[in-house]
């Protein structure tokens, strides 16, 4: 690690501590337990021979987007039972009816605590999760699957690890990124797993979520269980010429999205690529088409239009 990067890390840590202290001083009732507005069975009956997926979703306009339905459909086709956990303000009757066709349970909860509290709510509302052979924690922060996903359960189960993610990150502490975390049976039955989610609290400071819960999950569970990423940062960097490699630890889904797709047929694209890096939909569509993706970017039209509107409003 270079001296420059070490200094940057120290500065970020100090900023984090200052922001966390400020958040703690200003926080009042934000830590109250989020209200569960709705929790009912879907049209599909649970199948305890299948792994369960707890899928967290949020939309500013309280719409379940086409790309979310596509992801849910692919999860179901791959062999997952799905519990849908929404933190949007509401779920329309039309969406409830459509979601029921993909899910064994649909939950609507107050928007507090980000995804880790959403997954905690899912575990509380569907305590039968431990009867399934495995558990996937997933969310709609990604677009996809971009390529064939039918064998994903086999790939996860065949991986020589107890907890399997798509990608890893080295910020704060080496950890698996939480947008896709698969836990095998011994993990979900363990005291460590149960204890971790028991102590999850409402935290409204996003970087604290990453540090305390995303990195903290790997740090705690890694003391007993083996962790692995299907598309590890080391593996991705090996495919990039040395001079073109980032000179610091980075988020591979954000900085290396293109080589992930072109070299590995990576099944997901982080939404933040389009919202924060300002990569155009046309560029993404071209990369996907050139690499034989089956993902229809046409289903993103309404979502991309919303991003453009928010950008115009924010620039005024």
Where in the sequence are the language-model features?
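ER/Golgi luminal nucleotide-sugar-dependent glycosyltransferases, focusing on the catalytic module
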Residues: 1-316
């Amino acid at each position: 690690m270079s001296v420059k990067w070490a200094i940057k890390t120290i500065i970020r840590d100090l900023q984090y501590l200052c922001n966390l202290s400020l958040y703690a001083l200003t926080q009042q009732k934000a830590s109250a337990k989020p209200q569960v507005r709705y929790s009912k069975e879907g049209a599909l009956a649970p199948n305890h021979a299948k792994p369960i997926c707890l899928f967290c979703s949020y939309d500013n306009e309280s719409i379940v987007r086409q790309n979310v339905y596509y992801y849910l459909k692919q999860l179901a086709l791959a062999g997952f039972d799905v519990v849908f956990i929404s933190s949007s303000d509401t779920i329309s009757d039309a969406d409830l009816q459509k979601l029921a066709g993909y899910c064994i349970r649909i939950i609507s909860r107050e928007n507090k605590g980000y995804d880790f509290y959403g997954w905690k709510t899912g575990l509380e509302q569907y305590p039968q999760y431990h009867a399934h052979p495995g558990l996937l924690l997933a969310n709609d922060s990604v677009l996809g699957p971009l390529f064939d996903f039918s064998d994903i359960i086999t790939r996860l189960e065949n991986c020589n690890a107890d907890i399997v993610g798509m990608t890893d990150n080295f910020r704060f502490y080496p950890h698996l990124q939480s947008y896709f975390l698969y836990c095998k049976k011994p993990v979900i039955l363990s005291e460590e797993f149960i204890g971790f989610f028991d102590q999850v609290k409402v935290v409204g400071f996003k970087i604290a979520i990453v540090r305390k819960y995303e990195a903290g999950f790997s740090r705690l569970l890694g003391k007993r269980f083996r962790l692995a990423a299907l598309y590890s940062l080391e593996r991705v960097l090996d495919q990039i010429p040395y001079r073109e490699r980032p000179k610091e630890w980075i988020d591979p889904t954000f900085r290396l999205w293109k080589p992930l797709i072109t070299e590995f047929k990576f099944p997901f694209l982080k939404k933040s690529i389009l919202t924060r890096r300002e990569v155009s939909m046309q560029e993404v569509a071209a990369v996907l088409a050139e690499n034989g993706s089956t993902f229809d970017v046409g289903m993103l039209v309404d979502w991309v239009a919303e991003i453009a509107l928010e950008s115009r409003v924010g620039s005024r």
